[in-house]
Amino acid sequence: SGGSGGSGGSGGSGGSGGSGGSGGSGGSGNNDGPGGNYSYTSGMDKELKQILFEIEKKENYEGALKKLEVYVYENPQNANGWNLIGFASRKLEQYDNSEIYYNTGLEIDPNHEGIISYQGELYLKTNRYEDALENLAVLDELCNFNCIEKKALAEAIKVYEEENSL
């Protein structure tokens, strides 16, 4: 499925993979939450799952960000860690940091569907619509039939288009 998908990899990075049918698309009403991509938590160690709980259940992005900074320092080859720190940074509107974190994760796993999707949402937040469309095209190539990451980005693009009369 495009090479990611819980494949292990160095440092236990795994990928977000073709999550086919795993739950909803996140909890915050705008299809933007790690729940949809991570409800199965494939490729995540116990520590990362605990941090994910901070994000999903408590929406404690600041607390999660502090823990994720330590986590990625100790696990620099874990693309899932970079994805979550990018997500938490984006939710805190730290867009420059978020972009750096997503790019770092993609250097580790260029086919990480979760990062590609979230990076596309970051592009929308920073008014880079064309870049978001490019990420959607990449997901089109990578994703299987029921790809939550692709659906989430497509929905975010649709909302962006409606809000900006595109």
Language-model segment annotations:
Residues 84, 118, 152-156:
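Canonical tetratricopeptide repeat
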